Design a protein with these regions (language model features):
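Short glycine/acidic-rich loop motifs that flank beta-strands on beta-rich extracellular proteins
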Residues: 74, 87-88, 108-110, 129-130, ...
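Conserved short loop/turn motifs at secondary-structure junctions
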Residues: 79-86, 237-239, 326-327
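Active-site-proximal loop/turn and secondary-structure-junction residues that shape catalytic pockets
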Residues: 83, 213-215, 264-266, 298-300, ...
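Right-handed parallel beta-helix
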Residues: 101-102, 139-148, 192-202, 215-228, ...
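Extracellular beta-rich repeat passengers
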Residues: 300, 320-471
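Extracellular "leader-to-stem" segments immediately downstream of a signal peptide or signal-anchor
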Residues: 2-96, 100-193, 197, 206, ...
Length: 471
């Protein structure tokens, strides 16, 4: 079967199509923050004792300004120009936390300045350091300005790599990411009507912006630059985690892991929580270095559904669209609609797998720990998930109006004999790649006006592929 330049017959028809041939998506009009703090009284952190020298801890002074602002019914917390060193800050209802141009908020390099809080990290609920900026259990908060938030994360990167070097030979790759505590830069959790806009984030110690168990949130016009002074592990750009009605737009992300990532818990703990990520719009964003322009997973346990991503650009990102899970995650990822995408210098345009990073995904206790008292998060990770609950599903994924240049591989898709990759639709795609790639365990796919120009002139390799028709 030649797949280098082809047009395939439409095979899967969704229940409702609009005039343009796309599924009805009225839900896209009901995403993002619906309101922002309106009060205009300004509370300068400098009036509460913050010093703009980049060395003196301003945590207490900045928090005093935040508390005073909230106590007066809301307003603007702002800074005079300069550099401010801080540990964890906790925003409150009605506060606009403004970091103006000429201001740099520096994250402390001391882990003790980030108190442990109950949260979820990489799909598991556990105690973990609070972020530098926290929006927890509240509503109507905004974080913005033209300034810079610099996580000073390299010290935490180095600590992670040192621990991983120690853990991997002992069969502990599966737990090192959880034992190596690192602060996120901005955490929004259990909150509603939150806006993050116009800021530049640099050198995050861990995930940069994490939206967890929240709804009606907007991330707009942010720049993320985590490729500074080293290779930062798990320095994701924007993570949307078991949250709904989220809008991400006009952002530029350069990081060392997933650029924009949708998550919903992992393994036994994620299946217990069982909260989906749903109704997400992502538009007009650029991804530079990173692991995925748009990633779903690998934490899929609660399900990921109803996602529209459009107007995206990938410039050197490792993978364009990445769907990843493991055979102990479970969950259904479906109704993922991606259109108007340009990709250049990506390694793989579409990667989909149900067996992602086995050393990380499957937990096994080494014999040296038998009979020992284990940390709670170890016990959660070691809970066995049966094959029925643990099998993930990917279906109803649409990719349309995509241009690919100077890239290595068009697709690398691998389902499972118990869970085929189902009902994928590809339309109006022009790809110049080194090779077409491979598809295993796929069913009911449709390709319309798809051109793949592969340098090696070899066809797309198909195994266990059903109902892929062409004309």
């Amino acid at each position: 079967m030649k797949w280098l330049s082809l047009t395939l017959l439409l095979l899967v028809i969704p229940p409702v199509l609009n005039a343009a041939g796309w599924p009805e998506m009225s839900w896209t009009k009901d995403v993002g923050a619906r309101r922002r703090p309106a009060a205009s009284t300004v509370f300068l952190v400098n009036d509460y004792g913050a010093v703009a020298d980049g060395r003196t801890s301003g945590t207490a002074a900045i928090q005093k300004a935040i508390d005073a602002c909230a106590g007066k019914g809301g307003g603007i917390v702002s800074f005079l120009p300069g550099k401010y060193l801080s540990g964890s800050l906790f925003l409150k209802e009605g506060v606009h936390f403004q970091i103006p141009e000429g201001v740099v908020l520096l994250g402390s390099t001391q882990l003790s300045d980030y108190p442990d809080i109950p949260t979820r990290v990489a799909g598991v609920e556990m105690m973990w350091p609070a972020a530098l900026i926290n929006v927890l259990g509240t509503e109507n908060v905004s974080v913005g300005g033209k300034g810079i938030v610099h996580g000073q994360g390299k010290v935490f990167w180095d600590a992670y790599w040192a621990l991983r070097k120690e853990y991997e030979p002992r069969g502990l790759r599966w737990i090192v990411d959880y034992d190596s505590k690192r602060p996120r830069t901005l955490l929004v959790a259990e909150s509603t009507d939150i806006t993050v806009s116009d800021l530049t984030f640099q050198q995050s110690g861990f995930w940069t912006i994490h939206i967890l168990y929240s709804q009606y949130c907007t991330v707009d016009n942010v720049v993320i630059q985590n490729n500074i002074d080293g290779h930062g592990p798990s320095t994701d750009g924007i993570d949307i985690d078991s949250s709904s009605k989220i809008l991400v737009q006009n952002s530029d992300i350069d990081c060392n892991d997933d650029n924009i990532c949708l998550k919903a818990g992992r393994d036994a703990d994620g299946l217990r929580v069982n909260r989906p990520t749903e109704y997400v719009v992502i538009r007009n964003c650029i991804s530079r270095a990173g692991a995925g322009l748009l990633t779903c997973g690998s934490e899929t346990s609660g399900g990921i559904r109803y996602v529209l991503a459009e107007g995206l650009r990938a410039k050197g990102t490792s993978v364009g669209v990445r769907l990843k899970s493991a055979m102990n995650r479970g969950g259904i990822t479906e109704h993922i609609y991606i259109r108007d995408v340009d990709m250049e210098n990506v390694r793989i345009v579409l990667e989909a797998t149900m067996n992602w990073n086995p050393a990380y995904s499957y937990s096994k206790l080494p014999g040296e720990f038998n009979g020992r008292l284990l940390p709670d998060h170890w016990n959660k990770m070691l809970q066995v998930v049966d094959s029925v609950r643990g099998t993930p599903f990917f279906r109803n994924v649409w990719l349309s109006d995509v241009k690919i240049r100077n890239s290595a591989e068009f697709m690398r898709v691998s389902g499972n004999k118990t869970s085929y990759m189902e009902q994928f639709s590809f339309r109006n795609i022009d790809a110049q790649v080194q090779k077409a790639g491979s598809v295993n365990y796929a069913r009911n796919w449709e390709f319309t006006n798809v051109t793949i120009k592969a340098d090696d002139l070899k066809e797309l390799r198909l195994q266990h592929a059903e109902n892929l028709q062409k004309k």
